[in-house]
C-alpha cells in the first residue's frame, strides 16, 4: 500500500490550512455516506487525502460545507 504524504497533497492544494479544511470536509462527507471518487478500503480521512493527492477533489470542498 502506498503511503500518502502531505507533500503529495500540497501539489494539488498548496496552502496547508486550505488542505486541512478540504480534507476534513471531504472526510466528513465520506463518513456520512457519500461515494468515494477512488477505489479504496481505507478510513474516510485517508480516502480524502488520497482523493486530493490524485486530483479528484480540490478547493471546491471549501465551498461545500457539510451539513
Curated annotation (Swiss-Prot):
SMART domains on file: RNA_pol_Rpb6
SUPFAM superfamilies assigned: RPB6/omega subunit-like
Gene Ontology CC terms: DNA-directed RNA polymerase complex
Biological-process GO terms, alphabetical: DNA-templated transcription
Reaction catalysis annotation: RNA(n) + a ribonucleoside 5'-triphosphate = RNA(n+1) + diphosphate
UniProt keyword terms in alphabetical order: DNA-directed RNA polymerase, Nucleotidyltransferase, Transcription, Transferase
Residue stretches spanning the membrane: none
Enzymatic class: transferase
Disulfide bonds: none
Alphabetized Gene3D superfamilies for the sequence: 3.90.940.10
EC number: 2.7.7.6
Single GO MF descriptor: DNA-directed RNA polymerase activity
Domain of life: Bacteria
Family that this chain belongs to: Belongs to the RNA polymerase subunit omega family.
Function: Promotes RNA polymerase assembly. Latches the N- and C-terminal regions of the beta' subunit thereby facilitating its interaction with the beta and alpha subunits.
Subunit structure and binding partners: The RNAP catalytic core consists of 2 alpha, 1 beta, 1 beta' and 1 omega subunit. When a sigma factor is associated with the core the holoenzyme is formed, which can initiate transcription.
Protein's name in the database: DNA-directed RNA polymerase subunit omega
Organism field: Delftia acidovorans (strain DSM 14801 / SPH-1)
Classification lineage: Bacteria, Pseudomonadati, Pseudomonadota, Betaproteobacteria, Burkholderiales
Gene name, Swiss-Prot/TrEMBL: rpoZ
Amino acid at each position: 500500500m502506498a503511503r500518502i504524504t502531505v507533500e503529495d497533497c500540497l501539489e494539488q492544494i498548496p496552502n496547508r490550512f486550505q488542505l486541512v479544511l478540504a480534507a476534513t470536509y471531504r472526510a466528513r462527507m465520506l463518513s456520512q455516506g457519500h461515494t468515494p471518487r477512488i477505489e479504496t478500503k481505507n478510513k474516510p480521512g485517508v480516502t480524502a487525502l488520497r482523493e486530493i493527492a490524485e486530483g479528484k477533489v480540490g478547493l471546491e470542498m471549501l465551498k461545500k460545507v457539510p451539513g
